[in-house]
Amino acid sequence: MGFSQFGSAVSKGVLAKSPINEASGLVASRENPGFLWTHNDSGDESRIFLIDTLAQMRAIYYLEGVEARDWEEIAWLQADGTNYLIIGDIGDNRAVRPDITIHIIPEPHFSAIVDSIAAAIIDTIPATSIQTYKLHYEDGPRDAEAMFYDPQKEQLYIITKRELQVGLYGVKIPQESSEILLLKRKATLPFTFITAADISPNGDEILIKNLLCVYYWQRKSGESMEHTLSREATRQPYQPEPQGEAIAFRIDGGGYYTLSEQLLGLQAHLFFAPHNQPNPIK
């Protein structure tokens, strides 16, 4: 598996008395550097949370007119100079959904919250600002919890969860089509029970995790995602968390965060693992 690119993770804070009790997605904010977006698993309202790097709640945003069936992942994309968030309603435990859904919203920008954590801002993303796509797997329904957007190839990738060897699926977004978009199988990966993934801001590094391990790839220049992930991964230091389903690169690529659920009375920590190569993203 090779040497470790990241050091051991340390706790940066605890989600104390927080409505985030089943964190199931994490991504670094581009509009608000030093902050992270997350959301709950199925059963919650249609909302996303902004936390700082000490796990303190800063803002809650509701998505008007959107159903939260089984939100599992959140990702980032930039188009025409605008930062967007992609919310993945991609969970399907029984693999019965004929299609899954993603919602794309302009990333909210804040200024007043930086100096105060007295109370979280609460606001709403209007329905007119939400772009929704329905997606369909080319080979039938799948359960998935891992999703990221590749800025180099302008592709959204979803990694399935429950197979003994999971699938990597891709689709180009954004698109103007109102039809259900086809998720094409790009590769089969020798992992199982994948719960989260992220890509570095420049698209050169990829992280994938399950409940026990974090895996890392360094992408070669011009390489497709399927070729990158078909190479052997390097396994990173990781202390398993209670139902750990969230991972995100820091905005400068200098490490990654993980966030877990509050499970069986255990606290949910925000962990940070530093990159052994300082500031690798140029």
Over which residues does each language-model region extend?
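Sequence/structural signature of beta-propeller domains
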Residues: 2-282
